[in-house]
Amino acid sequence: MKPLERAMKTLTLIMGLFLLAMIAQSSYAQQSPQPPTETIKTAASHTPEQQEVINLSNIKWDWMADKKVDSLETLFDDEAMFTHMGGTWGKTQELATIKSGGIWYKKAAVYAVDARIFGNTALLLEDIDLQAAVGEHEVTNPFMVTEVYIKENGKWMLTQLTFSHLLRPVKMNSNKN
């Protein structure tokens, strides 16, 4: 076999192996599962304590939409932390942001809620679409909201509120108010 023929066969073999590897990789990529679009379901029934926290959370969304910072001030623990897409801050800054309209929580559409009670701690997960005005821009985003409440002296206090952006599309019909 001449050197040129040997080089051509080697090159053909390498190209064939490369093509086979590309096909295998493409096939694997097409079989990869898509990320989940919904991770929680609302239970058919809740304990009275779970329902109390769910109701409190719903009232909180109304207070935020109506900018009722006096009501929110009594709900938020003094050491509470709020995690948004743009950063994390405490109670004072959250209330100031709501009062000034820096973030106006116009409407929260809650699609699913999971409430769990651990002693005097309540963990709430909510699958929501949030319509908000951020500065001069109105936006609607899908979030998984995590809320943590602590019961002190018979009263639930919000200690943590975190917005985690979801990959699913927005479900809310947005008719700008």
Give each language-model segment a name.
Residues 30-74, 79-177:
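A beta-strand edge to alpha-helix "cap/lid" segment located at domain peripheries
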Residues 21, 29-30:
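A cross-taxon signal for low-complexity, glycine/charged-rich
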Residues 2-15:
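Bacterial N-terminal signal peptides that target proteins for export
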Residues 12-24:
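Bacterial N-terminal signal peptides
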Residues 9, 23-26, 117, 124:
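Short stretches within intrinsically disordered, low-complexity N-terminal or propeptide regions
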